Amino acid sequence: MESTASAVPPSSEDLVADTKENNQPPFCGTTVSGSSQAPLHPHSPTLQQDEREELTLHQSGEQQLGNSGELRQEEELPKARRGGWNKGRKRKRSPRDNNAPKAPLTGYVRFMNERREQLRTERPDVPFPEITRIVGSEWSKLPAHEKQHYLDEAEKDKERYTKELQKYQNTDAYQTYSRKAKSRQKGRQQRQEGVRGVPSNTEKESILKERPIFDIPIFTEEFLNHSKAREAELRQLRKSNMEFEERNAALQKHVESMRSAVQRLEAELSQEHERNSLLQQHLQSVRQALTHCLQSVPVPGTTETPTLETIDLYMSRLQNAVLTHPKESEVIISGVREVLSQLEG
């Protein structure tokens, strides 16, 4: 009977039930919800295929979670610091070439140097940054024709610097400085490349052994006393600097007053020179007139008549003769009076 039943083909109702069971989402080891559904056989082909698909999805989900966890761990790791200049470390400047020609000054710098000294003299109480701001404002408001003067001077200075630089580049001093600069640049590049390279553990240990360790007692009483002494010294230096600046300002005022006095005396001296030249011209004209008018009046007791070169000596001798013999010289005195009256006329 059992063999006969097993040989009977399934009916259409059984096929429909089996189709309904396959359309439901299977779960391994569980039953489908619903009172009308029957439990699935664990060894059915449909259940094995669903379990394989579920296992594949589970493994892919775990792999994605693992990848995302690794990404988060990589993001949480501190990023390696990029190579560059250490914070707090001062960059060393290249040594200056003392033999090189002096660099040219711009028009604004020339105006600032000239105007800054004037402002410091006129207003010594104004601080340096305020003076710089005032000079910058004046330069921006300066007319174009006045500004052109400083720009022309700067252009001349630039031409001078170009010529001197061309001459200097042909000298041995420049060649020596250029070789030293190239060697310094090469050494700096090598040091930077050495810093970029990551040393091994043994190299790190050797570096730590060779590096001296300085124990700086910054919180001890001696260090605090040293800091206080340095602060007191700095305060004293600032005070001395302020006193010297005040003295310098007073001396600048005194120098300006002396300059104005010298200029005033020079103006008076030039006026006196002009007056002297006018008096010399007038005296020369008087000598010429006396020489011309007294040609016929000789000195008493002599035959001496005046000339342009001897008029001063002639007048002195004539005065002595008149004072010595006044009665005998009355005729000469009357003649001289007539001549002088003609001269005045």
From Swiss-Prot:
Residues 101-169 bind DNA. InterPro entries: ChromReg_NeuronalGeneExpr, HMG_box_dom, HMG_box_dom_sf. Residues 1-130, 166-206 are annotated as: Disordered. GO terms for molecular function: DNA binding. It is found in: Nucleus. Its main location: nucleus. This is High mobility group protein 20A. It comes from Xenopus laevis (African clawed frog). The lineage of its organism: Eukaryota, Metazoa, Chordata, Craniata, Vertebrata.
